[in-house]
Amino acid sequence: SDQLNVIKYDNAAQEQMQRPGLKTGKPQGSFPSFIPKTDQERIQNLTHLWHTLPSDAQFEETLKLDGSSMTCYKTTYTPTLWDKIKSFFGYKLMNYHFGVCSRNLELAPDANNTITFDNQGKSSEYSQSNFWTAAKKYSIESKLPIGYAVQGELIGPKIQANHEKVSTLEYYVFDVFDISTGLYLTPAKRREFCALHNIPHVPVTDVSFTPFQYSLQDLLEHVDGESMNPGTISEGRVYKHLTS
């Protein structure tokens, strides 16, 4: 995030590459090279920006949910000769590829085995890929236009010890990436995109916040408080510049 396109504060000192207590299912391949991963810098590491950006610079402020990063994307696909041959036997020809990814991998849709393991002292059990289950729950494959990727937070009863206190798998988008241009939509355009396509958006706490009118310590105190559900402590806030 060169000039604070994205800044983040969260209470954890380090972000894990893959959250514990989460069954990702059968890997299909590497994370797509044409989509950026979702890592974002912590604001404590960006103190120089208090001296390089104007104090009235405006940002969208959203909740930092405690779950696992999930990316869904759809690209154009040209059926092969083999695909066309299979179509004579009932195989449905598709003009697109839809992918579902964890933080580091694209996942196959057919993982359905059960695994039980320890998650920070609590037993966890999954019978299939949480990522594909959530994608199907929200019908993202049918809603997402070709040429776009949505990136968001997957939360659930056994993900991160259910920090957000939810009763089922839930998914909230925090970024929309235009694959054809190689650019993220601006915050306003992203919110419009999610509303238009009926895809859940991460809770927005301010659409024009000015973080650099605060000292770092005051900003850290500002982000303390409840998360999206009563009785849950917020993981922090994510700030994204309004025009980039």
Q: What role is predicted for each listed range?
A:
Residues 1-244:
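Core nucleotide-handling region used for phosphoryl-transfer chemistry
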